[in-house]
C-alpha cells in the first residue's frame, strides 16, 4: 500500500512538472538529413532540461514567408523560426522579429564566422542567431580536371581544352542568365549593387549601372557566346545533367547540388578562383540560415532564446554539421576531429569567409528582375552591357518608387454606401417583382437544395472578389496598408510609369494578351473541329484508340507539359532545334525575339487546348442527324457546302459556350507564360495575369497595384463575355 501511494505521488509530481513546462514552437523548412538533425536537437534539449518543451513544425519553403507575415501579427505564429537572412529587413520593419540583446550578440561573435554575423545586421542592430550558410563554389570532376584552377585564366584554359560544343561538351557550366550565379563575377570585377556594407549610397538606393558591373556582364557574355565554354540558356536541370554525364568538367553551384550528383560521379569542390583581369577573388553571395525569434505579446521569448543557445552551442553545431551535413557558422567546429578531414565542408567555410553577405534590405529584392533582364539582353547580344544596365537602373527606380499619397476614405465610403443602397433597392424590387417570399413559402424544397451552391458561391467567389477589389484601393509595403483611392487604377490606365509601347505598360500587355487569346482559341477550335470531323467518320478504324490518345495532352497537368516543351525549345539541347538541324537549318534562339518566343508559348498552349474543343465538337457532331447531310448531298451540295450550311450552323450552339470558356482560360493561362518563355524577351510576352503576379510577389509586394490589375482583368473578361453572348444571340 505504501509503495502504491509512493508511486502515485511520483506520478502526480512528474505530471505537475511536465504540465509546468512551457511550449516553444519552432517553424522550419528543413528536409532530409537537416530535418533529422534538428529533430535530434529538439529531443536532446527536451531531455536535458525540464523548463521548456520544444515543438517543431515543418512548413513548405514556398509558403513559409507568407505564412509568417500573416500569422505572427495575429498571434498565431511560432515562437521562433529558421529561415534565410535576406528577409530580415522586411520583418524588422514590420515588427515581426525581435532584435538580439547586446550580450547575446557579443557571445555569438566569439565563435562565429564574421560574414555570417554581418548578414544578420540591419540598421545597426542584430536580429538573429546564425546557424548555417550557403554559397556557390567550384565543383569539378576529378576524372577530368587534375589541377584546381587558381585563376580565371587557368579555369578558362582547362575549360577550353575540354569543350566540344558540337557534341554538347562544355568545360564550365553555370546558370549564366541568373543574377545569383553571376554575382561572383560582378564582385570579382569590383562591381556592386550599393546595398553592401561600406558601399551604400546616401539615398539608400541601388546602383546597377556602374562600369564594373558592365565589365562583369561583358565577361560572362564572352564565356557563353565568344569562347563557347559555357552552355547557352543553361538551367539547373541542364547543369546537373551535363555534370553527371561527364559533358561538363566544372560547375559553379551550391551545397544543394551535392544531392543531385549521381553516386558514381567522382568529384570534389574548390574555392572560386581569382579574376586574372582584376586580381580580385570571385566572391559569391552568402546566404545565412538564421534562428529568428518572433516579436509579439504571447511569444515564449525566454524559451525560444534557451533553444537558440543550445542549437548554436558546440554540441548543437556538431550534430548539425556531422549528421545534418550543414556548413555551420560555428568556427571551432571545423577544428574538431569529426570535420577536420572533411574537405567539402571546409571548402564551403573558406568560401564563406570571403563571400559577400546578400543584403537584407527590402529593396534588394527589387533588383533581381531588372538585373536578370539586363543579363539576358547582353547574353543574346540585344544591347551593350552599359545600355542594358542603364535600362535596369531605370526599371529598378520605377519598381521601388514611393507609395502613392494616402487619401481620406470618407468620400469613397459615402459612394459605397450610396451604391449599396441602390443595390439593396434593386434587390428588394426584384424580390417583390418575382414574388420570391411567396414562392419560398409555397415550395421551399428547391431552395433547400440550392442553398449549398449559393452559400459556396458567396463564400468562394463573391467574398474573395469583394476583398480583392477592396485591396485595389490600398497601397502595401512592409506589411502596412494605406488607403490611396483610385491611385492604382489611375497609374495603370494612364501608364504613368511606362510608355504605352513599353512591354511593361498595361496597354502593351493587354494587346499581347488579346492576341495571345485570339490566336490560341482560333487554333484550338480549328484543330479540335478538324479532328472531331475525322473521328466522326465510320470509315476510320480504331476511332476509340485515337480519341483516347488525343485526349492525353489535356489530361496531363499543364505545368508538366509546359516544362517538357520548355526543354524542347532549348537552343542547344532542345528537340525542336535538333529537328531543324537534321534538315540542314540553323538552330533558333526561341526566347530571344518576340515572335519566336510568342510562337513557343502558342505551340505549347495549342497542344494543351485542342483536345477540349475536339471533345466538345465531337459530342455535338454525334447529335446531328446524318439524314440532314444526306439530303444536302442529294441536292448536289459538296463537302464544304454541307459543312457550311448544315453542320456548322448546328454546331454553333455547342461551340459558343466552349469558345467563351476557352477564351477565359487562355486569357488567364499563367502557367504557360511563366514556365515556357518567362515573359521573354524583356517582358514582351507577358500577359495581364502574369504581370499582376509579378507586381504582387516580385516588385516589393505591391498587392494593391496587383489587385487593381486583377480587377481590370475581370472587367475586360466581363465585357468580352457579355459582348460574345449578345453577338451569339443576335446571329441565332
Language-model features: locations:
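Hinge/lid segment of periplasmic solute-binding proteins
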Residues: 84-137, 147-158, 185, 268-272
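Extracytoplasmic/periplasmic substrate-binding proteins
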Residues: 29, 181, 218-303
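Conserved C-terminal helix/tail region of periplasmic/extracytoplasmic solute-binding proteins
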Residues: 353-423
Amino acid at each position: 500500500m505504501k509503495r502504491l501511494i509512493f508511486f502515485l505521488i511520483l506520478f502526480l509530481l512528474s505530471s505537475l512538472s511536465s504540465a509546468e513546462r512551457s511550449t516553444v514552437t519552432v517553424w522550419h523548412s528543413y528536409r532530409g538529413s537537416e530535418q533529422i538533425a534538428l529533430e535530434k536537437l529538439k529531443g536532446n534539449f527536451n531531455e536535458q532540461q525540464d523548463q521548456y518543451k520544444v515543438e517543431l513544425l515543418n512548413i513548405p519553403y514556398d509558403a513559409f514567408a507568407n505564412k509568417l507575415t500573416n500569422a505572427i501579427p495575429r498571434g498565431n505564429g511560432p515562437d521562433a523560426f529558421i529561415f534565410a537572412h535576406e528577409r530580415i529587413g522586411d520583418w524588422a520593419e514590420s515588427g515581426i522579429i525581435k532584435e538580439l540583446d547586446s550580450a547575446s550578440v557579443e557571445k555569438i561573435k566569439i565563435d562565429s564566422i564574421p560574414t555570417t554575423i554581418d548578414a544578420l545586421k540591419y540598421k545597426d542592430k542584430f536580429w538573429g542567431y546564425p546557424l548555417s550558410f550557403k554559397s556557390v563554389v567550384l565543383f569539378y570532376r576529378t576524372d577530368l580536371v587534375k589541377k584546381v584552377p587558381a585563376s580565371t585564366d587557368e579555369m578558362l584554359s582547362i575549360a577550353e581544352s575540354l569543350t566540344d560544343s558540337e557534341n554538347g561538351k562544355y568545360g564550365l557550366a553555370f546558370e549564366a542568365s541568373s543574377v545569383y550565379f553571376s554575382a561572383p563575377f560582378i564582385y570579382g570585377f569590383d562591381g556592386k549593387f550599393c546595398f553592401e556594407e561600406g558601399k551604400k549610397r546616401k539615398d539608400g538606393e541601388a546602383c546597377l549601372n556602374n562600369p564594373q558591373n558592365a565589365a562583369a556582364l561583358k565577361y560572362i557574355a564572352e564565356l557563353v557566346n565568344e569562347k563557347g565554354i559555357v552552355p547557352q540558356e543553361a538551367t539547373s536541370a541542364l547543369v546537373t545533367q551535363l555534370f553527371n554525364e561527364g559533358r561538363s568538367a566544372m560547375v559553379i553551384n551550391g551545397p544543394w547540388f551535392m544531392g543531385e550528383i549521381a553516386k558514381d560521379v567522382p568529384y570534389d569542390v574548390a574555392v572560386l578562383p581569382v579574376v586574372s583581369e582584376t586580381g580580385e577573388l570571385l566572391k559569391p553571395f552568402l546566404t545565412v540560415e538564421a534562428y529568428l525569434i518572433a516579436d509579439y505579446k504571447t511569444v515564449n521569448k525566454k524559451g525560444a532564446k534557451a533553444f537558440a543557445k543550445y542549437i548554436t552551442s558546440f554540441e548543437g553545431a556538431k550534430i548539425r554539421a556531422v549528421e545534418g551535413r550543414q556548413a555551420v557558422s560555428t568556427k571551432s567546429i571545423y577544428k574538431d576531429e569529426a570535420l577536420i578531414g572533411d574537405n567539402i565542408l571546409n571548402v564551403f567555410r573558406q568560401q564563406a569567409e570571403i563571400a559577400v553577405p546578400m543584403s537584407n534590405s527590402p529593396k534588394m529584392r527589387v533588383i533581381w528582375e531588372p538585373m536578370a533582364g539586363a543579363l539576358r539582353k547582353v547574353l543574346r547580344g540585344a544591347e551593350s552591357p552599359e545600355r542594358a544596365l542603364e535600362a535596369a537602373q531605370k526599371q529598378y527606380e520605377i519598381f521601388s518608387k514611393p507609395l502613392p499619397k494616402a487619401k481620406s476614405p470618407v468620400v469613397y465610403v459615402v459612394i459605397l454606401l450610396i451604391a449599396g443602397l441602390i443595390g439593396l433597392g434593386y434587390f428588394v424590387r426584384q424580390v417583390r417583382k418575382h414574388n420570391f417570399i411567396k414562392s419560398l413559402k409555397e415550395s421551399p424544397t428547391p431552395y433547400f437544395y440550392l442553398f449549398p451552391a449559393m452559400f459556396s458561391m458567396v463564400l468562394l467567389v463573391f467574398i474573395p472578389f469583394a476583398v480583392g477589389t477592396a485591396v485595389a484601393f490600398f497601397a502595401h509595403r512592409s506589411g502596412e496598408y494605406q488607403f490611396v483611392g483610385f491611385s492604382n487604377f489611375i497609374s495603370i490606365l494612364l501608364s504613368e510609369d511606362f510608355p504605352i509601347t513599353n512591354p511593361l505598360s498595361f496597354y502593351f500587355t493587354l494587346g499581347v494578351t488579346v492576341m495571345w487569346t485570339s490566336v490560341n482559341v482560333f487554333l484550338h477550335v480549328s484543330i479540335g473541329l478538324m479532328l472531331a470531323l475525322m473521328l466522326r467518320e465510320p470509315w476510320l478504324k480504331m476511332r476509340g484508340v485515337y480519341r483516347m490518345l488525343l485526349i492525353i495532352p489535356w489530361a496531363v497537368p499543364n505545368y508538366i507539359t509546359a516544362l517538357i516543351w520548355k526543354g524542347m525549345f532549348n537552343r542547344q539541347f532542345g528537340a525542336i532545334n535538333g529537328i531543324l538541324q537534321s534538315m540542314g537549318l540553323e538552330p533558333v534562339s526561341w526566347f530571344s525575339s518576340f515572335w519566336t518566343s510568342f510562337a513557343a508559348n502558342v505551340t505549347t498552349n495549342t497542344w494543351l487546348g485542342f483536345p477540349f474543343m475536339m471533345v466538345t465538337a465531337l459530342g455535338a457532331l454525334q447529335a446531328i442527324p446524318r439524314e440532314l447531310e444526306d439530303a444536302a448531298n442529294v441536292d448536289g451540295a459538296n463537302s464544304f457546302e454541307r459543312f457550311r450550311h448544315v453542320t456548322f450552323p448546328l454546331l454553333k450552339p455547342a461551340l459558343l459556350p466552349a469558345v467563351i470558356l476557352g477564351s477565359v482560360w487562355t486569357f488567364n493561362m499563367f502557367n504557360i507564360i511563366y514556365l515556357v518563355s518567362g515573359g521573354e524577351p524583356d517582358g514582351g510576352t507577358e500577359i495581364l495575369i502574369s504581370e499582376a503576379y509579378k507586381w504582387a510577389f516580385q516588385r516589393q509586394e505591391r498587392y494593391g497595384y496587383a489587385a487593381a490589375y486583377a480587377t481590370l482583368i475581370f472587367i475586360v473578361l466581363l465585357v468580352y463575355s457579355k459582348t460574345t453572348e449578345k453577338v451569339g444571340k443576335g446571329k441565332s
